[in-house]
Amino acid sequence: MIPELMVQQQVENVWQHMVGVICLNLTDRKQVKPVLTELFKMTPTPEEFLRVWDHDTLSDFIKPLGMFNIRAHRIMRMTHDILKWDGEDATKLFGIGKYGSDSYRIFYLNDIPTDVTDKQLKKYIAGIK
């Protein structure tokens, strides 16, 4: 992944986007990018991900990010959810809150929320206006 770009600008699908959102929670993107690059190389889709990973192996893999048990749980649950998700409200996906919803709206729905609070998303919005 390119260091200057946001993770959201470098993923191939909505599932990867949401995994990135979960991994970025309380963690700098410089730590997250190498882990996601390897994860998505091995399993680029949610279906492939569920065939390869379980909670324990994922926890070990994402250990460098910290909070690895919590993140693994959220990623596993979100991945199951996304396979049934209607693509509307991102907060219906397990582990996805306001930041994830705002990010999804910006990058996938071309809808700029007026109440964005995340500083990186604000910077991105300012740059596209």
Report residues per predicted region.
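N-terminal polyanion-binding entry modules of DNA glycosylases/AP lyases
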Residues: M1-G87
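Catalytic DNA-binding helix-loop module of base-excision-repair DNA glycosylases/AP lyases
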Residues: H17-C23, I75-I128
